[in-house]
């Protein structure tokens, strides 16, 4: 009888062990990513331990079971910044990072800024890592992640990254990717971020998939002074291939995303809801295939004044895509929103022979399926 009493406990532990790991597989450009593979899961208990696991040279599956709060761990800085968007209580102000205020906003009012140093630079993530959250428990607060300088084969799934100096532009980014390859970010929630939720820098980042993520733009501070975050997704790489699928972008006001450099972007089945300014900025060197997306209460689906790149996407299905990606393109949908349209076949030619994500009809499902806790 004593042995029998232990059986449920053993069974529960076995079930938990089986459940710990990456769920599903990436679609699109990062479809061959494996992350930490079958490495034995590790469970950091301190911020130092988390930093160590992410930054070492071992293949790892790293499981977050609690909040790792970096706020205050590196002290604070008080300095003079600027207020380019005004001094009202709901406006972001800027840190004078690299003399940005001095060189580019010399006419803006000067203001005192006090920011948390930990947010300024994210945690380095080295190659062959899977960083996953357990349920809704895995949170990194006050500091982001940096996947840079040749890092590759990385999966980030089912975590939240929050509260990185939200009042301050240049206060820090949630996820930075630069000169990387095979990165899959899936079911991640980002909220109350000072600068970009996602930024792909000017170096080439070859195969990236951002899927089923919740970009929560609601904030007490914004550059548009209206509780809608302006700095959301910035894709600026010299040779980037990015799949953006199934994401929910809520209460944004710009750069959602901003695409330029030499970036191939497949934006498919995303849901933009309550955007007070514009979603896409499509600049020089951007090739954007947009299909099956829903824009609801979005003032402008694409900013016309900065539109110098290439776009294929419309409100009707297109058989033109068949000879390039092996299927028809799916119509975008618009509700109380500005529209986007483009029929540049040069865009489709960039995707020929590439691993392209599937597409379904536009809808609101990302609102309930994207982000942490919705695997």
Swiss-Prot record:
InterPro entries in alphabetical order: Pec_lyase, Pectin_lyas_fold, Pectin_lyase_fold/virulence, PEL
Keyword Secreted: yes
GO biological process, one term: cell wall organization
Cellular location(s): Secreted
Keyword Lipid metabolism: no
Top enzyme class: lyase
Glycosylated sites: 128
Active site: 255
Annotated disulfide bonds: 82-101, 91-225, 321-329
Signal peptide start and end residues: 1-19
Annotated GO CC locations: extracellular region
Keyword field: Carbohydrate metabolism, Cell wall biogenesis/degradation, Disulfide bond, Glycoprotein, Lyase, Polysaccharide degradation, Secreted, Signal
Superkingdom of the source species: Eukaryota
EC number: 4.2.2.10
Gene Ontology MF term list: pectate lyase activity; pectin lyase activity
Reaction equations catalysed: Eliminative cleavage of (1->4)-alpha-D-galacturonan methyl ester to give oligosaccharides with 4-deoxy-6-O-methyl-alpha-D-galact-4-enuronosyl groups at their non-reducing ends
Protein family according to the UniProt entry: Belongs to the polysaccharide lyase 1 family.
Alphabetical list of PANTHER family matching this protein: PECTATE LYASE 18-RELATED, PECTIN LYASE A-RELATED
Function: Pectinolytic enzymes consist of four classes of enzymes: pectin lyase, polygalacturonase, pectin methylesterase and rhamnogalacturonase. Among pectinolytic enzymes, pectin lyase is the most important in depolymerization of pectin, since it cleaves internal glycosidic bonds of highly methylated pectins.
Name of protein: Probable pectin lyase B
Protein source organism: Aspergillus fumigatus (strain CBS 144.89 / FGSC A1163 / CEA10) (Neosartorya fumigata)
């Amino acid at each position: 009888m004593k042995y029998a009493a232990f059986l449920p406990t053993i069974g529960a532990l076995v079930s938990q062990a089986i459940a710990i790991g990456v769920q599903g597989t990436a679609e699109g450009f990062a479809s061959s990513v494996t992350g930490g593979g079958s490495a034995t899961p590790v469970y950091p208990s301190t911020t130092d331990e988390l930093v160590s696991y992410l930054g070492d040279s071992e293949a790892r599956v790293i499981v977050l079971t609690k909040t790792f709060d970096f706020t205050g761990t590196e002290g604070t800085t008080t300095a003079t910044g600027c207020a380019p968007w005004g001094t009202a209580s709901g406006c972001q102000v800027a840190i004078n990072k690299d003399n940005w205020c001095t060189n580019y906003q010399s006419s803006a009012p000067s203001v005192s800024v006090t920011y948390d140093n930990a947010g300024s630079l994210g945690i380095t993530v080295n190659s062959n890592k899977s960083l996953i959250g357990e349920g809704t428990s895995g949170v990194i607060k006050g500091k982001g992640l940096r996947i840079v300088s040749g890092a590759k084969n990385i999966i980030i799934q089912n975590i939240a990254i929050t509260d990185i100096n939200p009042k301050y532009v240049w206060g820090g980014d949630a996820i930075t990717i630069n000169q990387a390859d095979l990165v899959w970010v899936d079911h991640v929630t980002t909220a109350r971020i000072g600068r970009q939720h996602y930024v792909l820098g000017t170096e080439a980042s070859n195969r990236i998939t951002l899927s089923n993520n919740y970009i929560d733009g609601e904030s007490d501070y914004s550059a548009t002074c209206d509780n809608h975050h302006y700095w959301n997704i910035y894709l600026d790489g010299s040779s980037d291939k990015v799949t953006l699928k199934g994401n929910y972008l809520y209460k944004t006001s710009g750069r959602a995303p901003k695409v330029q450099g030499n970036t191939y972007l497949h934006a498919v089945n995303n849901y933009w809801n309550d955007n007070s300014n514009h979603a896409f900025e499509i600049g020089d060197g951007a090739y954007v295939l947009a299909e099956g997306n829903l824009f609801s209460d979005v003032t402008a689906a694409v900013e016309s004044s900065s539109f110098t790149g290439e776009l294929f996407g419309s409100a009707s299905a297109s058989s033109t895509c068949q000879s390039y990606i092996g299927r028809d393109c799916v119509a975008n949908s618009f509700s109380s929103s500005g529209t986007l349209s483009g029929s540049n076949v040069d865009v489709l030619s960039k995707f020929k022979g590439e691993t392209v994500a599937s597409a379904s009809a536009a809808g609101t499902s990302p609102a309930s399926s994207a982000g942490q806790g919705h695997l």
